[in-house]
Structures are given as structure tokens and as C-alpha cells.
Amino acid sequence: YLQGVGSNKWDPNYTWGRQVIPPENVKSLEPKLFVKREKGCLAVKKLSKKLPLNEFRLMNFKKMNGNSLDNLDINSYLLRMGREEGDYRYFIVYDNYLNILSYNCSNYYGLSVGLLSDKFK
């Protein structure tokens, strides 16, 4: 199914996404990042607006090892998972993640597939 459904095609040159460390001011950034979406399933509606990865880098989101995100101009979205403040986990996801969601539109499913696939690299 990773070959794509409809307009969502898997790009083997990129990954699905990654967990990230948010900047200290993430709460103040969220109103600008998360805008109401009219289209898409619930999982897609929970993604931030689309931004180039280098914009998340400029906002000081970091890789889990503390290094800066890559300075790339690829479509990226922020995903916030968790039930309450202080319990949130943040992920930067790419167009390949949307391909996963086109098969089963659940962020729990998408993250499970993505994180499990990382174990096989």
C-alpha cells in the first residue's frame, strides 16, 4: 500500500517523520501552527499547517538527540499527540505520513507504522 493511493505516493527518498523536541515557547507557537481544516479525516485535521522543514528548524524544534533539524525545503507538518499539557509528544511528519493515513486515517495507526518501520532500518 505504500506505493500510494490516489495522489499520495510514497517517496523512497524521504522518511515518514520523526519525534522532535519542541522549543520552550511551543505553547505560544501552537495557535499560529494549528489552523482549522475543513477537509480531510480527523487525523489529517489534527496536523499543523504545511510548512517547509527549515521553518520548523528556525522555530527551534530539535531532533531527539538535541541536534538541529535538517535545513531542507520539504513539506512538513507538526503533530501533537497526548491527552493533556505536559503529556504531549511532538512529531514532524512528511508527505509519506499522509500516504500512510490514506490507507487508515488514524494518527495512532500512522505513528505505529512509522515507528515500527524505523526499527527495521
Predicted segments with their positions:
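Acidic/His-rich structured neighborhood in mature extracellular/periplasmic domains
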Residues: Y1-S7, N13, K27
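C-terminal soluble interaction/assembly domains
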Residues: W16-K121
